[in-house]
Design a protein with these regions (language model features):
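Signature of uroporphyrinogen-III synthase
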Residues: 1-162
Length: 162
């Protein structure tokens, strides 16, 4: 039996992603876990523009792809699987040919789950870290795809790329 250093404690888990895994880790150590996700990650309400972007990408629209989140890459594939499964293989083939630049460990892990790896990983998993990594690259004339997330664009990164 594992030690129970958290026995008698109630721990609120405000995580959304991997909540069950995190809760189970705490419960194995004796904690009573209250799941209270504060953030909901939702798919785009209209899959049409997402699918169009995926089709463009599969048609070799990018030389480089900057992946900011692993969740975003997995959700692109889930959208493809739900709405146009025939697009999955061409999308993955294009992803394999494209130089993949990751912001942190989560997009790198998502790539590994697909049998791929990042070509360039930011030294720091921040917007500034990715910009610093990009400064060392010659991007002029290259078609760069940027995975955005949320409702606000990443202005510093978008402005750097322009």
């Amino acid at each position: 039996m594992e030690p129970q250093p958290l026995a008698g404690r109630v721990i609120a888990v405000p995580e959304t992603r991997e909540i069950d895994l995190f809760a189970a880790m705490l419960e194995r150590r004796g904690a009573k876990v209250v799941r209270c996700p504060l953030v909901a990650i939702r798919d785009a309400p209209d899959p049409a523009p997402v699918l169009q972007w995926c089709r463009n990408f599969a048609a070799d629209a990018c030389d480089d792809l900057i992946l900011l989140t692993g969740e975003g890459l997995l959700r692109l594939l889930a959208c493809i699987d739900r709405h146009d499964p025939t697009l999955r293989d061409p999308f993955l083939a294009a992803l394999g040919r494209t130089r993949k630049i990751t912001r942190g460990p989560k997009p790198a892990r998502a790539l590994r789950e697909l049998g791929m790896k990042p070509d360039i990983a930011a030294e720091r998993p921040t917007t500034d870290g990715i910009i610093d990594s990009l400064r060392a690259l010659e991007l002029r004339g290259r078609r760069v795809g940027l995975q955005l997330y949320g409702t606000e664009p990443n202005r510093p990164l978008v402005e750097f790329l322009q």
